Design a protein with these regions (language model features):
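Acidic (Asp/Glu-rich) sequence patches and key acidic residues
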Residues: 1-204
Length: 204
């Protein structure tokens, strides 16, 4: 099980890649070149593998193993003192639900539990007419500030956080650090005037 964290665009985003994906240290990523494909699959027939340009709605994607949720829950979000978690859907009717201070878990895995962020429900329909709702988080200055705070704390508390590295080795502090760095870079590349064109989507 893992988290797929996306920045989705309301406009088409252009990419270049092979369409071949691998698991690397608990993350799923696309191989961008034929050389990378040959390195990972030296005995495979690559006749039908090509580097192509394509468009979708994905500006950014990070895949994180759920084994890192314990570590994420120990990363506080500076500037959110007094704010506590909202219940998830299955917790709404539980009388024993206990709100907790916000952590990176409530930013990366379940932003819908973060009351300081703005949320939106998108209504979707596939080619067969099936309808469904998608819960997303809007990108704004507060979200960017929280990601910056989480990345800063993660980068400066290696020794503390490495204690929560999973025993099975599937997922590491360095992986979480890299994901927060990459997410922050992607967010900072978006002009403030274009925030409305992008959304955060988390699939767990």
């Amino acid at each position: 099980m893992s988290l797929d964290l996306y920045i989705k665009s309301r406009r088409p985003v252009r990419h270049r890649g092979t369409g071949v994906f691998v698991r690397d240290n608990g993350q799923t990523r696309e191989l961008k070149t034929l050389a990378e494909v040959r390195e990972h699959f030296p005995d495979a027939d690559l006749t039908d593998v090509h580097v192509t340009d394509y468009e979708d709605d994905e500006l950014f994607h990070a895949n994180l193993t759920h084994n890192l949720t314990e570590m994420a829950s120990h990363i506080p979000i500076a500037g959110t003192d007094g704010a506590v978690t909202l219940p998830r859907d299955f917790e709404r009717d539980k009388p024993d639900f206990q709100p907790k201070p916000l952590s990176a878990y409530n930013l990366l895995w379940h932003p819908e539990t973060n009351p300081l962020l703005k949320h939106e429900t998108l209504h979707r329909k596939d080619e067969d007419g099936e309808e469904w709702d998608v819960e997303v988080t809007r990108i704004d200055a507060e979200l960017v500030r929280q990601v910056m705070a989480v990345q800063h704390y993660t980068a400066h508390h290696r020794e503390e956080l490495e204690r929560y590295n999973p025993d099975n080795g599937w997922g590491t502090y360095d992986q979480l650090l890299r994901a927060t760095q990459d997410l922050l870079i992607a967010l900072l590349d978006i002009p403030v005037s274009d925030y409305g064109d992008y959304l955060i989507y988390c699939s767990t």
